[in-house]
């Protein structure tokens, strides 16, 4: 369910805004989206894992807040990250 170092580094490299960027909103949204998709697949197999479901809802809320921040700051960055990750239809 968690990301190992190589997967995190790969996500950072694909979504960073400059060379040393590791914590921008884009990178955080990308990492949260990957963790959300992994946890969702875990919950499909383990229906009664309620503590993981609670963690999933917290991650979804955090991603939603970051995306709303990005939409308010820069509409262009928001639409780019949405298109890149494919999280909104």
Swiss-Prot record:
Pfam families: Ribosomal_S15. Keywords: Ribonucleoprotein, Ribosomal protein, RNA-binding, rRNA-binding. Residues 1-25 are annotated as: Disordered. One of its GO terms (molecular function) is structural constituent of ribosome. PROSITE patterns: RIBOSOMAL_S15. One of its GO terms (biological process) is translation. The keyword Nucleotide-binding does not apply. Residues 8-25 have a biased composition (Polar residues). SMART domains: Ribosomal_S15 (SM01387). GO terms for cellular component: cytosolic small ribosomal subunit. PANTHER family: RIBOSOMAL PROTEIN S15, BACTERIAL AND ORGANELLAR, SMALL RIBOSOMAL SUBUNIT PROTEIN US15M. Part of the 30S ribosomal subunit. Forms a bridge to the 50S subunit in the 70S ribosome, contacting the 23S rRNA. One of the primary rRNA binding proteins, it binds directly to 16S rRNA where it helps nucleate assembly of the platform of the 30S subunit by binding and bridging several RNA helices of the 16S rRNA. Belongs to the universal ribosomal protein uS15 family. This is Small ribosomal subunit protein uS15. It comes from Parasynechococcus marenigrum (strain WH8102). The lineage of its organism: Bacteria, Bacillati, Cyanobacteriota, Cyanophyceae, Synechococcales.
